UniProtKB/Swiss-Prot annotation:
A motif (SH3-binding) lies at residues 73-80. GO terms for molecular function: DNA binding; SH3 domain binding; zinc ion binding. Transcriptional activator that activates both the viral long terminal repeat (LTR) and cellular promoters via activation of CREB, NF-kappa-B, SRF and AP-1 pathways. Binds to two 21 bp repeat elements located within the LTRs, referred to as Tax-responsive element (TRE). Binding to TRE requires the interaction with CREB1 and CREBBP. Activation of NF-kappa-B leads to up-regulation of the expression of gene promoters containing NFkB motifs like IL8 or BCL2L1. Inhibits the action of p53/TP53 and MYCB. All these functions could lead to the possible occurrence of lymphoproliferative disorders. Belongs to the deltaretrovirus Tax protein family. This is Protein Tax-3. Transmembrane segments: none annotated. The gene is tax. Residues 116-145, 213-248 are annotated as: Homodimerization.
């Protein structure tokens, strides 16, 4: 399907791009100030000009790889506004500082959710559907918690610029093949560029599975993982659940919050909740307005759920930021409620 030449928006980020022929979208090369090649991928996370051998960030114009590393143009949205005056010689970009996270934090993480039995396992039970994600433009959101003083993003689902994140995570758990489930036909190299850009812009510690997704741009933290990727999307529509945002559980007892179920054949946006919520409301399912009144959740502009907790109670604070509490020989969780058992769906009238 071809488009008429003209201006449009990036399918992934929404920044201004120029559309020309055969559904190809590209950005303007910072060196020449014009379209150098039609081979720029429309889903490119980092734009590349093969003619000038330069790679740059389409969001802020920062040159990532070039002999002219620090000749960074600040390009206006439209080429008629772009002149040689837009090229400015800037100082080298500052390197993002990695937050100081004590070793006890990583030790506690390996023993508690989402790490179970010293392995990063699925937290969504066994109910993985055999369906595709219905809308390529719809992205599930991240699951944010606060461990001590560090904001943790359990899984990297929201693929958007950092300025749109509700919280800037210090630690990110990520399975690259899960990202690939929501970015169809995107090479793994592009996924690496995404993680690398997040690493540069936030300074977050990125935790990837061992023996998976070898990286060349940066060296992330590795952790044991037997986690299966989501090749086919999210949970299917649940007919018995008619109210968006009900709290329910899977067969493994993991407490969850389900988002809207538009219609049969489409998935429900489901994110993991804290056992703290389940301990408070395990006898009934609650309407999102009830949870909002208790400041346990909030809606985003995409009408999906963000979980903002004061704590993630399955991980005792003493294990996170107390060096003496990190006993390697102790494999049992100390303190904090244990994940409940039973997978019955409980509903209540709202």
């Amino acid at each position: 399907m071809a488009h008429f030449p003209g201006f449009g928006q990036s399918l992934l980020y929404g920044y201004p791009v120029y559309v020309f022929g055969d559904c190809v979208q590209a950005d303007w090369c910072p060196i020449s100030g014009g379209l150098c090649s039609a081979r720029l991928h429309r889903h490119a996370l980092l734009a590349t000009c093969p003619e000038h051998q330069i790679t740059w960030d389409p969001i802020d114009g920062r040159v990532v790889s070039s002999a002219l590393q620090y000749l960074i143009p600040r390009l206006p949205s439209f080429p008629t506004q772009r002149t040689t005056r837009t090229l400015k010689v800037l100082t080298p970009p500052t390197t993002a500082t990695t937050p100081k996270v004590p070793p006890s934090f990583f030790h506690a993480v390996k023993k508690h959710t989402p790490f179970r039995n010293n392995c990063l396992e699925l937290t969504l039970g066994e109910q993985l559907p055999a369906m595709s994600f219905p809308d390529p433009g719809l992205r599930p959101q991240n699951v944010y918690t606060i461990w001590g003083c560090s904001v943790v993003c359990l899984y990297l689902y929201q693929l958007s610029p950092p300025m749109t994140w509700p919280l800037i995570p210090h630690v990110i758990f990520c399975h690259p093949e899960q990202l690939g489930a929501f970015l169809t036909r995107v090479p793994t190299k592009r996924l690496e560029e995404l993680l690398y850009k997040i690493f540069l812009s936030t300074g977050a510690i990125i935790i990837l599975p061992e023996n998976c997704f070898p990286t060349t741009l940066f060296q992330p933290t590795r952790a044991p993982a037997i986690q299966a990727p989501w090749h086919t999307g999210l949970l299917p529509c649940q007919k018995e659940i008619v109210t968006p945002g009900l709290i329910w559980t899977f067969t493994d007892g993991s407490p969850m919050i389900s988002g809207p179920c538009p219609k049969e054949g489409q998935p429900s946006l489901v994110v993991q909740s804290s056992t703290f919520i389940f301990q408070q409301f395990q006898t009934k399912a609650s309407h999102p307005a009830f949870l909002l009144s208790h400041k346990l959740i909030q809606y985003s502009s995409f009408h999906s759920l963000h979980l903002l907790f004061e704590e993630y109670s399955t991980v005792p604070f003493s294990l996170l930021f107390n060096e003496k509490g990190a006993n390697v020989s102790d494999d049992e969780p100390r303190g904090g409620p244990q994940p409940p058992t039973g997978g019955q769906i409980a509903e209540s009238s709202v």
